[in-house]
Each structure stands twice: as C-alpha cells, then as structure tokens.
C-alpha cells in the first residue's frame, strides 16, 4: 500500500507539532526541526516518538 501524500496536510510531528516531509525512497516522514524520521509501514505513518529514528547529518 502506498503512502497518501494528502496526509501531509493533516499530520504533524508528535514531538514539536511541526510540519513533516515525505521521503519516498526511505519510506519515512521527516521532521527537520527535531531531526527525526518516522517510519511508514504498509502505507501507514508510525508517528510514535519511541519509534522515531535520529537523522544523520547528511539528511
């Protein structure tokens, strides 16, 4: 199942409530403010702080 980009208009980072960006290749939603990546599993974003991955400096 593919991620529906329309969700970007309504979802927010659970930590800072900021805007998220979609990374199609990595299948993640990115919060640049907190430098966190939230996984997308079967088209569903997993917006749980304890499941977020820290971004590397290259992202």
Swiss-Prot record:
InterPro entries recorded: Trm112-like
Taxonomic superkingdom: Bacteria
A cellular component term, taken from the record's GO annotations: cytosol
Family: Belongs to the UPF0434 family.
The protein's name in its UniProt record: UPF0434 protein SO_2800
């Amino acid at each position: 199942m593919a991620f529906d980009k329309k969700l970007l208009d309504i979802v927010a980072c659970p930590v800072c409530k900021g805007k998220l960006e979609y990374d199609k290749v990595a299948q993640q939603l990115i919060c640049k403010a907190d430098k966190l990546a939230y996984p997308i599993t079967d088209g569903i974003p997993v917006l749980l702080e304890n499941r977020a991955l820290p971004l590397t400096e290259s992202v």
